[in-house]
Amino acid sequence: DFGAWFDSRYGQQFTGRKGSDIRTDLYVTVEEAFFGARKDIYVGMGKIEFEVAPGLSNGSTHRVTGRGQKGSTPELNGDLIVKISYLRHHQFEVRGVDFHTTMKISLPTAAIGGSEYVQVLEEKIKIKIKPGTQPDTTLRVQGKGMMTRVGLRGDLYIKIRVEIPTSLSSIERDFFEKMQAGLT
């Protein structure tokens, strides 16, 4: 064995060459990060199946030991460093463990209250709109955000957008004129 020969010849242990680490980005959907998934990563000539555990956070890095560049022995192979990056979601933005979205409501709903529904991944959530809700009001729904590694959930934040009608029927116009006259 070369290492033993080298040790006997020069009086020190031959340690060999460690392979370099390989860094890669793994792009996952919010759903994959929330529920968990298996993703294939192609490195060099090989494929590695990577377990996306539920609650992996955006920007987090994970080390897969021995799956980087080859070393002089298998024990000296480098590691694969995987950085998790969320793909943009069509419905909401993920900030930390919280979901942020907007909801359009009608002017009458803003004035007298009501309820609307918002879809968040696995469920449809009923949102109560209080009478007198102002444009750009932000509502918070606890425990309806992103899953964390320990099984807890962040919050859902909903920014209210009040839709102002661009065309009115004669009845609607009459109603708003009477309402305006009553306010002055």
Identify the role of each PLM range.
Residues 1-42, 72-75, 183-184:
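Post-J-domain flank of DnaJ/Hsp40 co-chaperones
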Residues 47, 51-184:
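Intrinsically disordered, low-complexity linker/assembly segments
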